[in-house]
From Swiss-Prot:
The VTT domain was previously called the SNARE-assoc domain. As there is no evidence that this domain associates with SNARE proteins, it was renamed as VMP1, TMEM41, and TVP38 (VTT) domain. The gene is TVP38. Its main location: Golgi. This is Golgi apparatus membrane protein TVP38. Residues 1-22, 345-383 are annotated as: Disordered. It comes from Debaryomyces hansenii (strain ATCC 36239 / CBS 767 / BCRC 21394 / JCM 1990 / NBRC 0083 / IGC 2968).
Length: 383
């Protein structure tokens, strides 16, 4: 006969309670970690802002106000702005050399320090649609990034090294590629949210990275350009008055979902690269501190400095070892030392040389220093 559950049953819910507690604890831990990360980023940003000079803080404030005004204007006049974009894209599409012009612009922004790759990518989607726009953008970006890589590898190598050393992320990822320049690692790196043109120049400074591997990685990661094409294509459709509000709402949601998915994907890939970098640190392949790689010139006058005495070196710059402590118990060494002392005293009596007890030099080889000596040495004269 089945037993009915009761409040006195000690086994009721025995398995469910620990599982529930474990799930809640893990969820709470994840939430706390994310909140700590957000607070940490905010505090780091604030500390960085306060460490800047007055003119730079003023410039940042002006840029922040300008961006806020632009956002407000877009929210108010978004319909007129989208319609203007549609008109411009239609005129561009009607140009005889429109495709060549867009190809040239995308090709050129592959060379650092030029910017504007994202805007041109969305423009390709607005003007030429999803499929045609992606083909044009992929060809221009792959060829532009590869040519930029070759130019900075063979003609502007010193400039490429400066670009790599100017960014902490570039330095970290370059150390990974120096140890493992496989195609898989480079593909993950190309999917990370790094500046497009700057990464082309910085990666050229890594001699272990083959040009063919770089070209293949750019080719394999070209489908990610569909995100920019899709967003640009949907932005143009928002300006089409023939479509209903429900269609516009779907377009807006699709843009938001696409952007969120792309951000999440790049965030996950970036975290994977950070964990791989940490793995290299744990194995000791890559030094954890940049000061180990590039040198640390701070605290030159710290207490860790070793104070050397010139009397500790002979004329050939070899350190004179102190053997007194090691051979103090050796009978042969003690007898030999006594003979040297007696011989030196006999020579002194005969006037062959004169011993100065205040010059800080152990003339007899006894390892004892005069109390009035200002030098601390175990060296002796060689006659």
């Amino acid at each position: 006969m089945p037993r009915l559950p009761s409040s006195s049953d000690p086994f009721q819910g025995h398995n469910e309670l620990p599982q529930s507690n474990n799930f809640m604890s893990r969820t709470n831990s994840i939430i706390q970690d994310k909140l700590f990360l957000v607070r940490n980023v905010g505090q780091q940003t604030l500390d960085w802002y306060q460490s800047q000079p007055l003119w730079k803080r003023t410039l940042l404030q002006v840029l922040f106000v300008f961006n806020a005004i632009v956002v407000v204007l877009i929210m108010i006049f978004h319909k007129s702005i989208i319609q203007a974009i549609v008109v411009i894209s239609d005129k561009w599409h009607g140009l005889k050399f429109g495709q060549g012009l867009l190809f040239t612009l995308v090709f050129m922004v592959g060379f650092p320090p030029l910017l504007g790759f994202s805007a041109l990518s969305m423009l390709a989607g607005m003007v030429y649609g999803f499929v045609h726009g992606w083909i044009l953008l992929a060809c221009a970006s792959i060829s532009g990034s590869f040519c930029s890589f070759l130019v900075f590898r063979y003609l502007l190598h010193s400039r490429a090294e400066r670009l790599m050393n100017s960014n902490k992320k570039f330095r970290a990822f370059s150390e990974i590629l120096r140890e493992d320049s496989s195609l898989f690692i480079l593909v993950l790196l190309r999917l990370c949210p790094l500046p497009y043109s700057l990464s082309n120049g910085a990666l050229a400074a890594i001699p272990e990275l083959p040009a063919t591997t770089y070209f293949l990685a750019s080719l394999i990661t070209s489908p990610k350009l569909m995100i920019h094409i899709f967003v640009g294509h949907k932005l143009k459709e928002l300006g089409d008055d023939t479509k209903g509000k429900s269609t516009h709402l779907i377009d807006i949601l699709s843009i938001i979902i696409t952007g969120a998915a792309a951000s999440l994907t790049t965030y996950i890939i970036y975290n994977k690269m950070q964990r791989k970098l940490e793995f290299y640190h744990q194995r000791g392949i890559i030094p954890r501190d940049d000061a180990i790689i590039f040198g640390n010139f701070e605290d030159i006058e710290s207490a860790n400095n070793v104070e050397l005495n010139s009397a500790d070196y002979d004329e050939d710059n070899f350190i004179i070892e102190d053997e007194d402590d090691e051979n103090a118990t050796d009978p042969d060494y003690v007898a030999s030392k006594k003979n040297i002392q007696v011989h030196a005293e006999d020579q002194n009596k005969n006037g062959e040389f004169e011993i100065d007890e205040n010059d800080g030099v152990d003339d007899l080889g006894l390892g004892e220093i005069s109390k009035n000596s200002k030098q601390n040495t175990n060296g002796y004269r060689d006659y």
